[in-house]
């Protein structure tokens, strides 16, 4: 047996104690200076510096051995005092005479041997003196004045009826009686346990059950026994002891904690309790020893509604499975819970069963359980959590004959659904289905009961909801938390959906159309997702602001940006993005329109100021300087005698002689002209070739007159031939006057090609541009020549 002196109370008064303690603490928790928790701090005495306004004081689990009046007398407003699990040996009740508001006093699990009785505040509701070293019951006559007392915890090695007389008139809610150190005597005592609704008896954990006292209680509604060790020989002792406690018509709840027994004795206890008026039987921490054999059990008509067994340790390794399971499967009760027992199976009842509620949590049931079982037609709730179910298709087959089944919980298994097995065959009555914490994927939506209203699929492997799913029009609550969904589903296939839980998924951009699609939604939990704060999310945030604050649960604290990094951790309600960056049309208007206006303005300005002409001049000058640097200076100086040969029409000679030559030769530039540099006696063609070869550049003054001159055509031909023969770039075209294309004879194809392919200098009519024109032209022909005669010999 396991000795559990730390927490002997399992039910009965447990709820009352928790409510009183925590209710009191919660009442003052808003003012933290009123609550002092110094438990587990190795104190050896009560601290002297406690706040005078302390209302809740916890000094439990320390090493305090003495209590003095001065320790707590100044705490006039003290309501809760916890001193359990210390080393206190003596108690003088007078130390509490100044604590007029004291309601809760816990001195359990100390070493108290005696109490000095004095009047005590009548406000006390909870007094626990259990698990101490008292010989007799520690009851003072002054306790009779505690008219508000609800809970009383006692312990003693000897029990006498007279000890209870001072409080016989009180109406208590719960009495805890510690009998761990009770000394058996030859004389059997009879003990009347007052008027209490709940009675909890704690026995020695390592001794076989043996009690030399008859205990009875008036109006007892709840009985709890802790530390019961039985075998086939002393089993009757327990049954005899219970006969005096279980005979009353008011006892409805019976609980056994930490029970070690044989299977035979356990069946006897069941058989003993079956005709009793008890309605709820609970057994926690049951250990079965020795053997498990088939036992005869007669299922009388019983008032028992529910049997609950939690945590069975079976120390019998070889036994008949049928002998064990049959006793439970054939019970004629409404509710049966057998959890944390590691049963591997449960039999189908042989006759139509009365079961309406079955709970087999944390066992080892497989897919074969309840297959082809047609005797559970009244079953309404079936819980098979934490078992070894693997096939959802077989689970659906299990339910086909459970015609009244409404709630099925098969969470925390290893369920999968393979469509190749066929369509699922659920019973049509199921409205609540828990499939959470399994291995289900998207295909699960094709294997659901037809009238399902509440569906829990959280913690599975679902990535999306198929759009072609049908038959879910009645679904009202859907839990898809902790899956891998990337999108917030709409209600196209869930027309009745009112509650959706989809937190802890992979949703980054929930659709703003959700609330339009889901008109009946009353609750949405979509927090704790990796939201990508972008323009798309802005619409969803706006839609959240348009619905009631009660609809979107966890808003705004659970809704935060996850990406980009600059917004990570930012609540969605604080995410701001400009209209310009999200509205493409507005962005185009804002950027493109001003750009177009600027471009038009620049174009007009350039045309007005003739900027293109200036740009062309600068580009030509730059290109000319670059090409000149690429030709070796020595080569140029060795062969060239002139900077430029000028070819022009006689009709343009006035401009050449008055404008062109003076502006070039004033910079020490040598110009070759036919009237002064052609050699007499040579042919015109030979002179043209020599002049072109001896000149760095050949300048052609183009005009309508130029195209009418045959010799100009020859000069252009030879210059063009020299351009391709030597790979040089020696042609400079000056457009003196515009030449219409139609005026160029077809025989002047080279001129057409040159004007189409090469950049030419255009003589500006505005005088302000002449300076740049001459500078550009001089730069294109300027090169240092070797000192030679300008004449051609």
Swiss-Prot record:
Highest expression levels seen in blood and lymph node, intermediate expression seen in spleen and lowest expression seen in the liver, lung and udder cistern. Residues 520-575 form the LRRCT domain. Residues 640-781 form the TIR domain. Disulfide bonds join 117-140, 235-265, 348-373, 424-447. Its main location: membrane. InterPro entries: Cys-rich_flank_reg_C, Leu-rich_rpt, Leu-rich_rpt_typical-subtyp, LRR_dom_sf, TIR_dom, Toll-like_receptor, Toll_tir_struct_dom_sf. It comes from the Eukaryota. It holds the Pfam family LRR_8. Homodimer (via cytoplasmic TIR domain). Heterodimer with TLR2 via their respective extracellular domains. Binds MYD88 via their respective TIR domains. Interacts with CD36, following CD36 stimulation by oxLDL or amyloid-beta 42, and forms a heterodimer with TLR4. The trimeric complex is internalized and triggers inflammatory response. LYN kinase activity facilitates TLR4-TLR6 heterodimerization and signal initiation. The heterodimer TLR2:TLR6 interacts with CD14 and CD36 in response to triacylated lipopeptides. Belongs to the Toll-like receptor family. This is Toll-like receptor 6.
């Amino acid at each position: 047996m396991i000795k559990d002196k730390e927490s002997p109370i399992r039910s009965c008064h447990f709820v009352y104690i928790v409510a009183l303690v925590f209710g009191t603490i919660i009442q003052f928790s808003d003012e933290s200076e009123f609550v002092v928790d110094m438990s587990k701090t190795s104190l050896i005495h009560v601290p002297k510096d406690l706040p005078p306004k302390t209302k809740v004081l916890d000094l439990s689990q320390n090493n305090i051995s003495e209590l003095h009046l001065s320790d707590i007398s100044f705490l006039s407003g003290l309501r809760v005092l916890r001193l359990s699990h210390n080393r206190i040996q003596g108690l003088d009740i007078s130390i509490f005479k100044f604590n007029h508001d004291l309601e809760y006093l816990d001195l359990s699990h100390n070493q108290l041997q005696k109490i000095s009785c004095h009047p005590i505040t009548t406000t006390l509701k909870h007094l626990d003196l259990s698990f101490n070293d008292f010989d007799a019951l520690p009851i003072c006559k002054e306790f009779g004045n505690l008219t508000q007392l609800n809970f009383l915890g006692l312990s003693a090695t000897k029990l006498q009826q007279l000890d209870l007389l001072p409080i016989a008139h009180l109406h208590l809610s719960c009495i805890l009686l510690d009998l761990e150190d009770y000394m058996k005597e030859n004389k059997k005592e009879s003990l009347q346990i007052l008027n209490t609704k709940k009675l909890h008896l704690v026995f020695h954990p390592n001794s076989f059950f043996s009690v030399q006292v008859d205990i009875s209680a008036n109006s007892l509604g709840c009985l709890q026994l802790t530390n019961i060790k039985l075998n086939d020989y002393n089993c009757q002792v327990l049954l005899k002891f219970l006969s005096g406690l279980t005979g009353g018509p008011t006892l409805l709840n019976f609980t056994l904690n930490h029970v070690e027994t044989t299977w035979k004795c356990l069946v006897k206890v069941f058989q003993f309790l079956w005709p009793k008026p008890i309605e709820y039987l609970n057994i926690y921490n049951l250990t079965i020893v020795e053997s498990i054999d088939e036992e005869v059990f007669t299922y009388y008509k019983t008032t028992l509604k529910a049997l609950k067994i939690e945590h069975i340790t079976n120390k019998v390794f070889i036994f008949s499975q049928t002998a064990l399971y049959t006793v439970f499967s054939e019970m004629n009760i409404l509710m049966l819970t057998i959890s944390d027992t590691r049963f591997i199976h449960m039999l189908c009842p042989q006759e139509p069963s009365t079961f309406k509620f079955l709970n087999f949590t944390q066992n080892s049931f497989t897919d074969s359980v309840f297959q082809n079982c047609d005797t559970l037609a009244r079953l309404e709730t079936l819980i098979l959590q934490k078992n070894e179910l693997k096939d959802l298709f077989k689970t659906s087959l299990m339910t086909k004959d459970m015609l009244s089944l409404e709630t099925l919980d098969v969470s925390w298994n290893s369920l999968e659904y393979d469509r190749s097995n066929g369509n699922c065959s659920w019973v049509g009555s199921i409205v609540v289905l828990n499939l959470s914490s399994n291995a289900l994927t998207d295909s699960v939506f094709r294997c659901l009961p037809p009238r399902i209203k509440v569906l829990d699929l959280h913690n599975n492997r679902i990535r999306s909801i198929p759009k072609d799913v049908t038959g879910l029009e009645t679904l009202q609550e859907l839990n898809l938390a902790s899956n891998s969904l990337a999108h917030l589903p709409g209600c196209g296939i869930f027309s009745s959906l009112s509650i959706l839980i989809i937190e802890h998924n992979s949703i980054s951009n929930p659709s703003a159309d959700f609330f339009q699609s889901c008109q009946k939604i009353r609750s949405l939990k979509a927090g704790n997702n990796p939201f990508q704060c972008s323009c798309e999310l802005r619409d969803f945030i706006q839609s959240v602001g348009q619905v009631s604050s009660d609809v979107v649960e966890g808003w705004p604290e659970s809704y935060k940006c996850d990406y980009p990094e600059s917004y990570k951790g930012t609540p969605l309600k604080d995410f701001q993005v400009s209209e310009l960056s999200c509205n493409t049309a507005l962005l185009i208007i804002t950027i493109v329109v001003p750009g177009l206006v600027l471009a038009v303005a620049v174009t007009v300005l350039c045309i007005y100021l003739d900027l293109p002409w200036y740009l062309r001049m600068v580009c030509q000058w730059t290109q000319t300087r670059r090409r000149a640097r690429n030709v070796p200076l020595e080569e140029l100086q060795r062969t060239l005698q002139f900077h430029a040969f000028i070819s022009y029409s006689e009709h343009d000679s006035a401009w050449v002689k008055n404008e062109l030559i003076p502006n070039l030769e004033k910079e020490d530039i040598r110009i070759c002209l036919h009237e002064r540099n052609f050699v007499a006696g040579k042919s015109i063609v030979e002179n043209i070739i020599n002049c072109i070869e001896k000149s760095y550049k050949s300048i052609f003054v183009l005009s309508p007159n130029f195209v009418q001159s045959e010799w100009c055509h020859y000069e252009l031909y030879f210059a063009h031939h020299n351009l391709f023969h030597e790979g040089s770039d020696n042609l400079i075209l000056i457009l003196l006057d515009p030449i219409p294309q139609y005026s160029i004879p077809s025989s002047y194809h080279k001129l057409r090609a040159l004007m189409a392919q090469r950049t030419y200098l255009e003589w500006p009519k505005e005088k302000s541009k002449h300076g740049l024109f001459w500078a550009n032209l001089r730069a294109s022909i300027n090169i240092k020549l070797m000192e030679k005669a300008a004449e051609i010999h």
